[in-house]
Structures are given as structure tokens and as C-alpha cells.
Amino acid sequence: MNIHEYQAKEILSKYNVPIQPGIAILKYEDIDYAIDSLATDTFVIKAQIHAGGRKIGGGIKISNDKNEAKNLAKNMWGMNLVTPQTGPKGQKVQRIYIESAAKIKLELYLGAVIDRSNHCITFMASSEGGINIEEVAHTNPDKIIKVKINILTGIQPFHSRKIIFQLGLTGDLAKQMAKIMSAVYSMLINTDATQVEINPLIITLDDKLIALDAKINFDDSALFRQPLIQEMRDEDEEDQLELRATKADLSYVRMNGNIGCMVNGAGLAMATMDIIKLYGAEPANFLDVGGSADKERVAEALKIISSDQNVKGILINIFGGIMRCDIIAEGVLAAAKEINLSIPLVVRLAGTNFELGKEILSNSKLQIVAANDLDDAARKIVEAVS
């Protein structure tokens, strides 16, 4: 789960990470009051969306005039903000953060992630903080400092010293960085965060470290024990089909292709997407109905896939182990009739009750194409949408 910048800063502030004074605006009519309430000479107006690169897209503005700041915020509200991370479709701005400007001497980068590959928490830092950190990581990876932390021992002084030394921080700045790293580590553990980024972490003209921008991602599977974090969820920022799938307990990720996929099992789903690409087409989604789906869940999965306007055909690939193929067939028929499915549908069933499942589908009056194996299924659906 993602949250907005102002929410991330609220959490970091509770762990004593320094931030600039700011006010979140959640209603258009609160813009004037918020700007009047912020005691600063220079206003920074920030669009709040779940994507980076806002400055490039015009989502961050600076003004020394209160009235101009109000107009900038009002013009920003409701705009469709397109950044390198939103894609061409962009994201509608429905929240704004007004912040006091800081006097910057240097921009650093500091991040921490759950590093599954190395079974640890990895801190990353760089002296090249700012909007182009991704480019720095790609073109000059030596500029990214990495420190791996064993979760059994936790963060130790020597972990902080490695980053502090390589960043060239000394004196009070070194002490500030050590405190911030310790705070970020504690916050990541306590809130079930999977990623924390402070970019930039600035050094001000009076040598203070301040988190000028922040991004935090959380483990969806741990939200049941993080009610305060769950309250921060902004469903307007999420893909509505993915949100609908989450509520139906379905693993669904939307993609850019035109062939929808319904599969049981993540490995089989990956193989299905691979073979679609092998035949020259692109999958429109990853959808795993799981191993114990019932008729209603299968029907909802098909409705979600068919709700994507980019989908021109659907491939259902089921291997029945715990799941019975006749249950899949009944769910498919129920959904197809309800939504009056008009696009090509290819179904490959194997495993428990697969013959009964095929019989149910063949006895229906719907235009459903049966496939003998995965290769046959992929070929048929690609031909059908070509």
C-alpha cells in the first residue's frame, strides 16, 4: 500500500525525523485558509499523488507571494498530472500539500527496503539526491552506498558510520544522520513498511538535516495489524480494478496488453503470460484466483477482467488440484451470461473434474473455445484477437 507525501512525513515526524512546517489540503475550499495559516515567506505547493517526478510534470510550484500561492494551488487542484511514473494517462490531483520552503545547501538521498534477495534490510544513500536519483542509480551505480542490516541484530552504530563516512558527513551532521537512520529503521519495522525513501534529505544552510520529500510503501498482507496505517489508504489513487480484486481476495495486477488471463497459481499465471508473449501478443493482466476459489469468486474474476476496456480476448487456464474444474466452469458461465460476454474466450481445463468442466462449457450456448493444452490455448486466443 502506498501513501501520500504528507502522510509519510507525518509518520516520520512521530519518529523524530525533522520535516518542514506544512499543511495538507483535502478540500478545495480550504486552500485560502491553509495558505493564510502557514507562517512562511516562501510557499511550496505540492500535488499529492502516488507517483514520483511531480516537479517534471508541473506538480510542484514555488511562490513568494501569498495570493499567487493561492492561485497556483487552485489551478493545481483537479489537474491531470502526468509524470514519468504515472504514464500518459496521468493522475488527477485531489489533495495538495503546502509547505514552507527550505534553504538548501546540499541534497542527499536516504532509503531503506526489505531486501528479499539478501534476506535483510538494506539501507541506501547517495550524495546525488533529488529528482534524478533513478538516473544516478542507472548511469553511476557507484554513487549509491548500500549497507545490509541483519534483522536479528538490528541497526548498529557501524552501519550508520559506513554511510556517514562515505557521504563525508562530520560533526553534528554525522550525529543527525545516525539518529535519522535509527528512526527510519524503527519506523520500517514497527509499521510493516517495505520501503522508505527520503529524497531529498537536505542539508540546510545552517547545517540541519531535513526530510524534504518522503515516500513509504507498506506490506498489504500486514495491514490487518496496522489499523492507523490502513486509515491512510487513498482508494482514489489506486487502480479501481485492482482495488476491486483486492476486496474479492484475488491477486490481480493490471498490465498494458489486450489478452486477459485467469489462472490458478502464481507460477501457472506467469507461464501463461509468457506463452502469450511467445505467440506475439501481450497479457492485459495477472490474475490468480487461488487454489480454493468458489463459483462466486471465479465469476467476479471474469467480471473484473472483462471490465478492462483494453481486453479483446480472455484466456482461462486452470489446473484443478484442490480446485475442481466443474466449479470453474460454473463460475465462468454465470459471469459470462450476466455480463453478456461478447469477446473471444478460450478455456483450458486440466486436473480434478476437468471432463465434467468441459462438458458444462460445451453444453452451454456461449461461444467458448476449448483448448487441449496451454500451447493450444495460447495459439487460439492470439488468433482470435488478431
UniProtKB/Swiss-Prot annotation:
<keyword id="KW-0460">Magnesium</keyword>
<feature type="binding site">
    <location>
        <position position="99"/>
    </location>
    <ligand>
        <name>ATP</name>
    </ligand>
</feature>
<feature type="binding site">
    <location>
        <position position="264"/>
    </location>
    <ligand>
        <name>substrate</name>
    </ligand>
</feature>
<dbReference type="InterPro" id="IPR017866">
    <property type="entry name" value="Succ-CoA_synthase_bsu_CS"/>
</dbReference>
<comment type="similarity">
    <text>Belongs to the succinate/malate CoA ligase beta subunit family.</text>
</comment>
<protein>
    <recommendedName>
        <fullName>Succinate--CoA ligase [ADP-forming] subunit beta</fullName>
        <ecNumber>6.2.1.5</ecNumber>
    </recommendedName>
</protein>
<dbReference type="GO" id="GO:0004776">
    <property type="term" value="F:succinate-CoA ligase (GDP-forming) activity"/>
</dbReference>
<feature type="binding site">
    <location>
        <position position="107"/>
    </location>
    <ligand>
        <name>ATP</name>
    </ligand>
</feature>
<dbReference type="InterPro" id="IPR005809">
    <property type="entry name" value="Succ_CoA_ligase-like_bsu"/>
</dbReference>
<comment type="function">
    <text>Succinyl-CoA synthetase functions in the citric acid cycle (TCA), coupling the hydrolysis of succinyl-CoA to the synthesis of either ATP or GTP and thus represents the only step of substrate-level phosphorylation in the TCA. The beta subunit provides nucleotide specificity of the enzyme and binds the substrate succinate, while the binding sites for coenzyme A and phosphate are found in the alpha subunit.</text>
</comment>
<feature type="binding site">
    <location>
        <begin position="321"/>
        <end position="323"/>
    </location>
    <ligand>
        <name>substrate</name>
    </ligand>
</feature>
<dbReference type="GO" id="GO:0000287">
    <property type="term" value="F:magnesium ion binding"/>
</dbReference>
<comment type="subunit">
    <text>Heterotetramer of two alpha and two beta subunits.</text>
</comment>
<dbReference type="GO" id="GO:0004775">
    <property type="term" value="F:succinate-CoA ligase (ADP-forming) activity"/>
</dbReference>
<feature type="binding site">
    <location>
        <position position="46"/>
    </location>
    <ligand>
        <name>ATP</name>
    </ligand>
</feature>
<dbReference type="InterPro" id="IPR005811">
    <property type="entry name" value="SUCC_ACL_C"/>
</dbReference>
<keyword id="KW-0547">Nucleotide-binding</keyword>
<dbReference type="GO" id="GO:0006099">
    <property type="term" value="P:tricarboxylic acid cycle"/>
</dbReference>
<dbReference type="GO" id="GO:0005829">
    <property type="term" value="C:cytosol"/>
</dbReference>
<dbReference type="GO" id="GO:0005524">
    <property type="term" value="F:ATP binding"/>
</dbReference>
<keyword id="KW-0436">Ligase</keyword>
<dbReference type="InterPro" id="IPR013815">
    <property type="entry name" value="ATP_grasp_subdomain_1"/>
</dbReference>
<keyword id="KW-0816">Tricarboxylic acid cycle</keyword>
<dbReference type="Pfam" id="PF08442">
    <property type="entry name" value="ATP-grasp_2"/>
</dbReference>
<keyword id="KW-0479">Metal-binding</keyword>
<comment type="pathway">
    <text>Carbohydrate metabolism; tricarboxylic acid cycle; succinate from succinyl-CoA (ligase route): step 1/1.</text>
</comment>
<feature type="binding site">
    <location>
        <position position="102"/>
    </location>
    <ligand>
        <name>ATP</name>
    </ligand>
</feature>
<dbReference type="InterPro" id="IPR013650">
    <property type="entry name" value="ATP-grasp_succ-CoA_synth-type"/>
</dbReference>
<dbReference type="InterPro" id="IPR016102">
    <property type="entry name" value="Succinyl-CoA_synth-like"/>
</dbReference>
<feature type="binding site">
    <location>
        <position position="199"/>
    </location>
    <ligand>
        <name>Mg(2+)</name>
    </ligand>
</feature>
<feature type="binding site">
    <location>
        <position position="213"/>
    </location>
    <ligand>
        <name>Mg(2+)</name>
    </ligand>
</feature>
<dbReference type="GO" id="GO:0006104">
    <property type="term" value="P:succinyl-CoA metabolic process"/>
</dbReference>
<keyword id="KW-0067">ATP-binding</keyword>
<dbReference type="GO" id="GO:0042709">
    <property type="term" value="C:succinate-CoA ligase complex"/>
</dbReference>
<dbReference type="Pfam" id="PF00549">
    <property type="entry name" value="Ligase_CoA"/>
</dbReference>
